Design a protein with these regions (language model features):
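Conserved beta-strand-loop-alpha-helix junction that forms the acyl-donor binding cleft
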Residues: 111-121, 137-141
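Acetyl-CoA-dependent GNAT
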Residues: 8-11, 15-85, 97-99, 103, ...
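Alpha-helix-centered segments that form part of catalytic cores
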Residues: 150-162
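Extreme N-terminal starter segment of soluble prokaryotic enzymes
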Residues: 1-3
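Acidic/polar short surface loop at catalytic or gating sites that assists cofactor/ion binding
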Residues: 126-148
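A contiguous pocket-lining binding segment that forms or flanks enzyme active sites
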Residues: 99, 107-113
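Conserved glycine-rich acetyl-CoA-binding loop
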Residues: 62, 81-98, 115-121, 126
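Short, P/G- and charge-enriched loop/turn segments at secondary-structure junctions
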Residues: 41-43, 145-152
């Protein structure tokens, strides 16, 4: 497994990975999420230019999982982590998250997620994230949640989560907030 920055010509592959990864939502009664359009190419390109776009690549150097993130209120906010189902359950999502934290410059990692989907909030809790109380939600995260609600994601319980930049158990892994 190798993690590297996504290239511009690979952006269409990220959309394919997200489509494939989203199919599992159909199986738990959330077909609207499975059918949701992945980010358009210009928006994905913005993460290359202004944020972070990482991929786990296979032996042929083709992305099989990806993570996009951007700075939000002093933390690196994970907008999306997707793993192609053919490569699921191999620790690729966790590896991308841990790699992001090691890039430096961020005091914490944040994300928003579905509270009751097994591979969402419960998974991220195992990766060291903790739910944020209402008073801990920063202005930038509030704006992200507002946009998610406008997109219809609030049909299911969602929450904001945060962890320190280092993996749980690593020296200095505690979340400073």
């Amino acid at each position: 497994m190798r993690i590297r920055t996504v290239t511009r010509d690979e952006l269409p592959l990220l959309r394919e990975i997200e489509w494939a990864a989203g199919e599992c939502f159909r199986e738990i009664g959330m077909p609207e999420i499975a059918d949701d359009e992945p980010l358009p190419l210009p928006e994905l390109a913005r993460y290359l230019d202004e944020g972070t776009a990482l991929a786990v690549v296979d032996a042929a150097d083709r992305p099989v999982a990806y993570l996009i993130a951007e700075p939000v209120d002093g933390a690196l906010h994970i907008e999306q982590v997707s793993v192609h189902p053919d490569h699921a359950r191999r620790g690729l999502g966790r590896a991308l998250i841990d790699h992001l934290g090691q890039l430096g410059g961020a005091t914490a990692l944040t994300l928003t997620t579905f509270a009751e989907v097994p591979w969402n909030a419960p998974y991220y809790a195992r990766c060291g994230f903790r739910p944020l109380a209402a008073e801990e939600i920063t202005p930038g995260l509030r704006e992200i949640r507002r946009q998610e609600a406008a997109h219809g994601l609030d049909r299911w319980p969602r929450l904001c989560m945060r962890r320190g930049p280092r993996p749980p158990g690593a020296p200095g892994a505690d979340d400073p907030a």
